[in-house]
C-alpha cells in the first residue's frame, strides 16, 4: 500500500515537472526577455522566463557595456529603470548624475536578476527549445512549447526574446535573413554596397600570394552587383571586457588551436600602415575601447581587420544547434587568436604590442567562462516579416506612428558583411555603413512586434522583429530591445484581459500604461525628466558615502 502511494506521488510530481502552465511564457533571457517578463509579472501575470543557457541579460551582461544609446532622452520605461538602478549601484545620484549607461557585466546581470526576483518571475535556466519539434499549435494559437529536457510549457501568450528567433521560426511565422534589394522597399541602404568607406583597408593589399593562393580570411566569391539582395549577414564578434589594472589582469589567452596563418592579412596590413601613416597603428585604431567603471573597457571592432569575424556567420541564423555551436567556437578562437597575435607576434610593431600587453582579461568578470564573455554578439539573425515591416524611411522621414510603443534614435549602423577580392585584385571589405546625420528620433510601432494574423495570434517578437536590414541597423540596439520587451509584457496582459489576438491589443490602453511606467513618446529632456520622477518615487536614495568608481568623472551642480 505504501509503495503504491509513493508511486502515485512520484507520477504526480513527474507530471507536474513535465507540464507547467503560465499566463506568459517568455523564451530567451536577453535584456529584452528580462523586461518582457518583469513587465508582465508586474501586471499580475503568472510568468516564466526560459533561458537556453545559464546567464540573463544577453549582451548587456555579456560584454556590451559601452551602451549604444544614440540620443539618451528617448530611453524610458524599464530600460531607463535598468540604467537608473545601475546608477544607484555606483552611487551616481550623489553627484547629480543618476544614470549609469555603461555598467560592468557582473553588475548588469545582478540588476537583471534582482528585477526578476522582485517581480516574482519564475526563471528557468538551461531550458532550450526542443529542436524542430518544440512548438505545438492549434490553428493560429501556440498551445505549448517543449524544451530539450522534455518539460512542456503551456501559456496564453508567448514572447520570443531570443537573438535567433527560434520560437518564432518553429511557430511557422514568416521571416527573412540577409539583405533586401534597394528596389524591394526603395531603400538606399539596402543590398550590396557600391562603396564601403568605413572600417576599410586604407592601403592596397593583394588578395593572393605570389603563387596565386588566396589569403586566409578573404572570400573568393564575387561581391555581387550593388543594390542586389543577398543572404549574407553582418559580422559578429564578442564584446570583450579588458582591464589595464595589473592586480585584476589576466594575460590574453592563446586558443588551443591557434593558427598564425589565419592572421597573415593582419600582418601585411600592420606592416603597410606604418609607412602610410608615418607611424605604427595605435591600439585604438585596431580596437574600439570604451571606458567603463573600475579600470575596465569594452573592446569592439575597429578598422579593416579587427575583432569582427567577417563572412563566417552566414549559416548561423537558420543553423541547427550543432552548426551554431561550431560557429560560436570558431568566432571565439578567431578573436582570442587576434588578441594573442597583437600581443605576441614579432611582426606587430613594438609600440602597438606594448599597448596590447598593458591590457588583459579581468579576473572578476565572466568567472565561469574563463573570463571570456558568455554571449556572442549576434547583431542580426532572423527578422520577422509581419503585417508591417519597418524600413529606412521609418528612421528618416516617416517618424510618427499612431501605435508608438518606444522611440529609437541611433544612426543606421551595419558592420561589414563580406571581405572579397575587388576588380583590381586587392582585398576589400563590403557592407558597413554608418549613417547618423539623417536619422532623427523616431517612433517604433507596436506592429513590428506582431506576426501576420493568419500565422500566429498569441506571439510577440521584440528582438527579431519585423524590419528590413536597413531599418534594423538602427533599431537593433539593446535599449530599444528592452523598451520593446517592456511593451510586449504589458501587451500580453491586455490581450489576456480582452481575450484578444495580439494584433488587436487596445493601443490606447497600452500607451497609457507604458507612459505611467515611464515610457517616452516625445524627444526632449523634459520627457525623460518626467520618467525619472516616476523612478525616484519608487527608489529611496542610498547612503551617500564613498568615491565614484574609476571611469565616472566627478560631476557637481553648477553654482
What is the meaning of each model-derived region?
Residues 4-13:
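Sec-dependent N-terminal signal peptides
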Residues 19-30:
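Beta1/beta-strand and adjacent pyrophosphate-binding region of the FAD-binding site
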Residues 33:
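N-terminal Rossmann-fold NAD(P) dinucleotide-binding loop
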Residues 40:
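Aromatic pocket-lining residues of Rossmann-like dinucleotide-binding sites
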Residues 45-46, 51-138, 176, 184-186, ...:
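Conserved N-terminal/central alpha/beta ligand/cofactor-binding core
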Residues 133-152:
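Conserved beta-strand-loop-beta-strand element in the redox core of flavoprotein oxidoreductases
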Residues 143, 151-157, 161-557:
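Flavin (FAD/FMN)-binding glycine-rich loop and adjacent Rossmann-like elements that form
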Amino acid at each position: 500500500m505504501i509503495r503504491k502511494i509513493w508511486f502515485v506521488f512520484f507520477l504526480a510530481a513527474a507530471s507536474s515537472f513535465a507540464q507547467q502552465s503560465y499566463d506568459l511564457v517568455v523564451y530567451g533571457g536577453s535584456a529584452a526577455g528580462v523586461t518582457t517578463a518583469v513587465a508582465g509579472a508586474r501586471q499580475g501575470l503568472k510568468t516564466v522566463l526560459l533561458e537556453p543557457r545559464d546567464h540573463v541579460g544577453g549582451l548587456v551582461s555579456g560584454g556590451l557595456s559601452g551602451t549604444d544609446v544614440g540620443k539618451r532622452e528617448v530611453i524610458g520605461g524599464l530600460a531607463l529603470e535598468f540604467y537608473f538602478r545601475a546608477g544607484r549601484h555606483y552611487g551616481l545620484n550623489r553627484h547629480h548624475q543618476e544614470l549609469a549607461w555603461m555598467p560592468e557585466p557582473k553588475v548588469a546581470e545582478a540588476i537583471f536578476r534582482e528585477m526578476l526576483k522582485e517581480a516574482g518571475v519564475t526563471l528557468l535556466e538551461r531550458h532550450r527549445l526542443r529542436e524542430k519539434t518544440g512548438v505545438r499549435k492549434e490553428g493560429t494559437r501556440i498551445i505549448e512549447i517543449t524544451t530539450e529536457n522534455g518539460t512542456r510549457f503551456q501559456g496564453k501568450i508567448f514572447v520570443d526574446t531570443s537573438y535567433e528567433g527560434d520560437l518564432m521560426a518553429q511557430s511557422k511565422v514568416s521571416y527573412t535573413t540577409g539583405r533586401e534589394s534597394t528596389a524591394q522597399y526603395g531603400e538606399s541602404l539596402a543590398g550590396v554596397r557600391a562603396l564601403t568607406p568605413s572600417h576599410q583597408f586604407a592601403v592596397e593589399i593583394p588578395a593572393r600570394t605570389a603563387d596565386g593562393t588566396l589569403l586566409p580570411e578573404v572570400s573568393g566569391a564575387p561581391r555581387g552587383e550593388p543594390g542586389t539582395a543577398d543572404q549574407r549577414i553582418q559580422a559578429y564578434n564578442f564584446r570583450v571586457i579588458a582591464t589595464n589594472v595589473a592586480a585584476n589582469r589576466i594575460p590574453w589567452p592563446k586558443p588551443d588551436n591557434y593558427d598564425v596563418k589565419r592572421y597573415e592579412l593582419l600582418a601585411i596590413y600592420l606592416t603597410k600602415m606604418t609607412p602610410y601613416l608615418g607611424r605604427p597603428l595605435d591600439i585604438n585604431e585596431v580596437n574600439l575601447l570604451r571606458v567603463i567603471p573600475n579600470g575596465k573597457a569594452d573592446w569592439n571592432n575597429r578598422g579593416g581587420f579587427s575583432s569582427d569575424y567577417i563572412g563566417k556567420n552566414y549559416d548561423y541564423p537558420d543553423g541547427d544547434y550543432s552548426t551554431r555551436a561550431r560557429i560560436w567556437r570558431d568566432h571565439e578562437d578567431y578573436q582570442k587568436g587576434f588578441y594573442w597575435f597583437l600581443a605576441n607576434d614579432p611582426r606587430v610593431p613594438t609600440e602597438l604590442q606594448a599597448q596590447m600587453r598593458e591590457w588583459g582579461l579581468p579576473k572578476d568578470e565572466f568567472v565561469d567562462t574563463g573570463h571570456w564573455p558568455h554571449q556572442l554578439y549576434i547583431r542580426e539573425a532572423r527578422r520577422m516579416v509581419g503585417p508591417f515591416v519597418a524600413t529606412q524611411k521609418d528612421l528618416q522621414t516617416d517618424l510618427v506612428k499612431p501605435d508608438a510603443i518606444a522611440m529609437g534614435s541611433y544612426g543606421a549602423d551595419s558592420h561589414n558583411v563580406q571581405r572579397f577580392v575587388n576588380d583590381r585584385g586587392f582585398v576589400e571589405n563590403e557592407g558597413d555603413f554608418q549613417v547618423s546625420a539623417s536619422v532623427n528620433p523616431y517612433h517604433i510601432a507596436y506592429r513590428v512586434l506582431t506576426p501576420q494574423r493568419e500565422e500566429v495570434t498569441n506571439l510577440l517578437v521584440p528582438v527579431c522583429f519585423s524590419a528590413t536590414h536597413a531599418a534594423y541597423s538602427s533599431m537593433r540596439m539593446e535599449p530599444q530591445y528592452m523598451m520593446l520587451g517592456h511593451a510586449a509584457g504589458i501587451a500580453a496582459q491586455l490581450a489576456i484581459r480582452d481575450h484578444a489576438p495580439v494584433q488587436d491589443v487596445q493601443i490606447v490602453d497600452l500607451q497609457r500604461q507604458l507612459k505611467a511606467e515611464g515610457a517616452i513618446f516625445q524627444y526632449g529632456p523634459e520627457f525623460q525628466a518626467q520618467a525619472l520622477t516616476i523612478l525616484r518615487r519608487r527608489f529611496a536614495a542610498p547612503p551617500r558615502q564613498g568615491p565614484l568608481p574609476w571611469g565616472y568623472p566627478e560631476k557637481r551642480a553648477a553654482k
